[in-house]
């Protein structure tokens, strides 16, 4: 059995390379503070303040709270992948949209590039639509003459005044080589016909990013 470390409320396997880990309450609180600015972006709760469910809080603590010490003594996010399989109607689209906006606006990247992927472009567009609603119905889209972020429906993109972009991409593999995303939101991974798109998006794509995030929130499939 691998050695386990208890870091605050999170249990992790001890790193094989001897990396020094810690649990950062502040890193978790930064994510929670951002979500406190958001509203729900779809269904009958649209416009209501965003209330995180227990599973969402657990995922945030586990992914964002664990940090490793870098060679220069600074701390960065230890985990690159957040993966959760969920039953239907469990808030997956909403939290995916919220996390996409977090990585677009709040994660410390100077020019973030957030990609939203799914089994088809229309499915990924549900995440975009929720994120767009959140931007346009909260302080993120204010003031109207100089907003922090705004949507470009013709391209299914959300831009920021600081040069960041969140965008819906097709599931075509051939034109995805060479992308460097600061964050990847992958919806309904179980519905992919094979692992080609996954491999193209994740193999080496973090080389130019200090703490790339790959977030997979999927409905449990048959395979």
How should each PLM-predicted stretch be described?
Residues 1-223:
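Phosphate/NTP-binding elements of NTP-utilizing enzymes
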């Amino acid at each position: 059995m691998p050695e386990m470390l208890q870091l605050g409320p999170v249990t992790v396997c001890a790193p094989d390379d001897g990396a020094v880990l810690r649990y950062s309450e502040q890193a978790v609180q930064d994510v929670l503070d951002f979500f406190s600015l958001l509203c729900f972006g779809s269904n009958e709760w649209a416009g209501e303040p965003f209330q995180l469910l227990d599973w969402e809080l657990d995922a945030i603590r586990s992914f964002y709270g664990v940090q490793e010490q870098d060679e220069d003594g600074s701390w960065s996010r230890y985990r690159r992948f957040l993966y959760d399989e969920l039953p239907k109607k469990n808030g997956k689209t909403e939290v995916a949209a919220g996390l996409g906006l977090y990585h677009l606006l709040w994660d410390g990247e100077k020019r973030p590039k957030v990609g939203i992927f799914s089994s088809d472009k229309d499915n990924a567009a549900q995440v975009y639509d929720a994120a767009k609603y959140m931007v346009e119905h909260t302080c993120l889209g204010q003031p109207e003459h100089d907003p922090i972020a705004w949507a470009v429906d013709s391209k299914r993109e959300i831009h920021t005044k600081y040069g960041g972009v969140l965008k819906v991409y097709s599931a075509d593999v051939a034109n995805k080589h060479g992308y460097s995303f600061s964050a990847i939101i992958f919806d309904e991974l179980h519905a992919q016909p094979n692992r080609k798109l996954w491999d193209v998006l994740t193999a080496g794509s973090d080389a130019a990013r200090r703490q790339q995030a790959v977030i997979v929130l999927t409905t449990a499939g048959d395979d």
